[in-house]
């Protein structure tokens, strides 16, 4: 779509997104915020949350083993033939406008999307190796539960940009 046609560019289409997040059930305020953006996105980019059980940590248990367990569960839960984006502090940063461009590109490709949030120690090396892209939300350290909400909001913002919706005001 060109700039003139962009208003109709992001109608409901075959592309869906999944957020695979390692961790326990989110606190009510995170779940409520995520659900709000999930609802807003539903007609542009349906977004499904898949919670992945965290690895066992604690006395006598190596964190690397827990991360490896989480990685195996994430990889097992991934649908086939999806565009995989791992959220990682060492990944590439995007502006909201750049994210909108990526979303437009993905929709043109027709593949579903999978966004991955790792556990406390991040992603297992096997997960990062399988990812098509690695993103960082910025140099700040964010609680993993908050990342769910921030990602959902940024996906909504990108979709709103593509649809010429007034939500995004730079």
Where is each model-derived feature located?
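N-terminal beta1-alpha1 ligand-phosphate binding loop
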Residues: 12-41
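Short hydrophobic segments within beta-strands
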Residues: 20-22, 50, 116
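Short glycine-rich anion-binding loops that position phosphate/pyrophosphate groups of nucleotides
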Residues: 25, 89-92, 119-122
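Short, surface-exposed alpha-helical segments at coil->helix boundaries
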Residues: 31, 35-38, 68-72, 125
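S-adenosyl-L-methionine/SAH cofactor-binding core of RNA-modifying enzymes
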Residues: 46-114
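A mid-sequence interfacial segment
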Residues: 101-138
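Structured adenosyl-cofactor binding patch, chiefly the S-adenosyl-L-methionine
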Residues: 125-169
């Amino acid at each position: 779509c060109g700039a003139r046609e962009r208003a109709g560019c992001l109608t409901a289409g075959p592309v869906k997104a999944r957020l695979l997040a390692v961790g326990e059930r989110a606190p009510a305020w995170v779940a409520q915020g995520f659900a709000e953006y999930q609802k807003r996105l539903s007609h542009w980019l349906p977004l499904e949350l898949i919670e992945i059980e965290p690895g066992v940590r604690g006395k006598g248990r190596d964190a690397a083993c827990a991360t490896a367990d989480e990685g195996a569960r994430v990889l097992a839960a991934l649908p086939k033939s999806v565009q995989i984006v791992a959220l990682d502090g060492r990944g590439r940063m995007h502006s909201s406008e750049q994210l909108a461009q990526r979303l437009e590109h993905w929709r043109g490709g027709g593949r579903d999307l999978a966004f991955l949030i790792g556990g406390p120690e991040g992603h297992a090396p096997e997960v990062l190796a399988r990812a098509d892209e690695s993103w960082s939300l910025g140099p700040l350290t964010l609680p993993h539960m908050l990342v769910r909400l921030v990602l959902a909001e940024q996906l909504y913002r990108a979709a709103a940009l593509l649809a010429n919706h007034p939500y995004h005001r730079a």
